[in-house]
Amino acid sequence: IEAHFDLLTANPELPLFIYREILTNECGKEICRKTLFPNFRLAISLLDRSLQEEIKKGTVRPVKAEDLMVSAISLNIFVFVANPLIQLFVEEKGEEYHQYMERRKQENVEIILSRLRK
């Protein structure tokens, strides 16, 4: 979750770019289908194996890997897609905004962890 958030911090326009490419550009859609989605499916498969082991041990609550992955991605992406709106009510600039983004990253991690905790 943190690595994904950091990737988006370094490339804040990436989520909207990918979204626009999928919606409006057949070539862009095909590139996403061939490059991003296989990696996404692999990540879900690996996550699912780990989750199933922990669910069997009773250390985490049952959850589908796809749902957990979509939740984590959604939490992270929203901060960047809605950034113009967020800046209206956060009213933090420069270092304060950087601190806000760090808090947001940690909050996203905590939300996902709380979904797993028994």
Predicted features, each with a name:
Residues D6-L46, D67, G94-Q99:
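Short secondary-structure transition hinges
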Residues V63-A65:
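Short, aromatic/basic-enriched loop-to-helix "N-cap" motif that marks the start
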